[in-house]
Amino acid sequence: MWRWLISLSFFVVVSCTSKNPAAASSLSLPPAGGSPNIFKRYSIRGDAEMMSGWSRSFDMSGVSFNEKMTLTLVTRRHVIMASHYRRKPGDKVVFHNRMGMRIERTLVGVIGVVGDVAVGLLDSDVPPDLKVYALPAPREDFSLLKGTTAAVTGQNRRIFFHEIDRVGSTSIAFRHPKVTKHGWGKNLVKGDSGNPSFFISKGELVLIETHTSGGGGSGPFYGSPLIQEKLSAAITTLAPGYRLRLKSL
């Protein structure tokens, strides 16, 4: 069910020593009623045409949208997904770079990590024009993220804006903003599982969650030391020599 939702503001964190996230420029925000679509024309078999509006500044090249079971790059060869909504080895994985050029790989292995996190291995590295997303560097307390804005994606290749409601040791949950000023929000439903959510840090998308539950959305929190430890071990099991990239919030 669609509903107008507009976020209070986007936030950028300035360093790991900052006590509070700082407000980002309004240039980071979509216009009221602006289309949430990432693609103007999407193609599984060929190149795509990207939207020319605000969503063009959000680098979604590291997200594979060719199936509802979305995959998100965390190394040049590893992708994460919802464990309860996995793709299978042998499946084709299609990305589109920021110019809309199609890039294909094959999924050759998938293993569960912890909770609702699974990691997959591609048959070869992706090129540097695809985005590999950083995860939040662990910190003692993430509670200051509560009330800030996250970019939340869905199965129909769109970007929405929800507030962070809570951050636990291994999970994070979102809510719809009470005050609507920018962009759209949506109630997440069946089929949205595994789609990623991001926090904006110094103009970069940092992966914080993949959907497990609907409504405002909730799922595993990728700033969790436990999840990062288990994920790193699984990455090494599938193909050694790759490391997660972490970014301080």
Where in this protein do the model-derived segments appear?
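A generic structural motif
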Residues: V94-R98, T153, F198-I200
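Chymotrypsin/trypsin-fold serine protease catalytic domain
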Residues: A22, V117-D192, I200, H211-A233
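A structural motif
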Residues: I44, G53, G62, N66, ...
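Catalytic-histidine neighborhood of serine endopeptidases
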Residues: T75-R76, I80-G115, D125-P127
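Sec-dependent N-terminal signal peptides
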Residues: W4-V12
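C-terminal subregion of chymotrypsin/trypsin-like serine protease catalytic domains
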Residues: N20, S25-M51, L71-R86, S171, ...
